[in-house]
Amino acid sequence: VWDGDVASMHPHSAIFECIFGPEYTRRFQDIVDARVAIKHKDFDAAGLMLNGALRPYLNEEQAADLAQALKIVINSIYGLTSASFENPFRDPRNIDNIVAKRGALFMTLLKQQVQALGYTVAHIKTDSIKIPDATQYIMDFIIKFGNEYGYKFETEANFEKYCLVNDAVYVGKFKDGKHAGEWTATGTQFQVPY
């Protein structure tokens, strides 16, 4: 089972919709781009972003923590766009969370397109799609389709074995990568040892 994941879906939806206006959306995009560069250990690119402010912290020891800190900032800003209270990021015209809606509509359309090509969609959530027996053709199709809407798909995992319990809980055995042969559980049902 191939697990394709959209990198920073909601932030990229906010960027594509220019939700903060041109100037502030560009600044928001700089933070998102810096996080992605750090996550992929591209310290040279990250060092050029945000006027070099992150350069002193760009090393193997601090990379994961820095990427996580930027993720918190990004998600906080995104969350404030649809908060019920007044704040500088909230637009009162955004009554139905346009950022989340854009992503949800995209994933619905993607599911329909993948199924129309004859593939099974085992699981689809906010920013990921899982396809059993995925071929290179369908993976390339999904990546290209995502690019057309401003989304970048990455391979989150390839599972040798996969058990979907419900819409939010699954257990899988990694097929390859640094965790090859290991099992993972998503959802508290299988993570509590008693």
Regions found by a protein language model. Give the residues of each.
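Conserved acidic
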Residues: 1-194
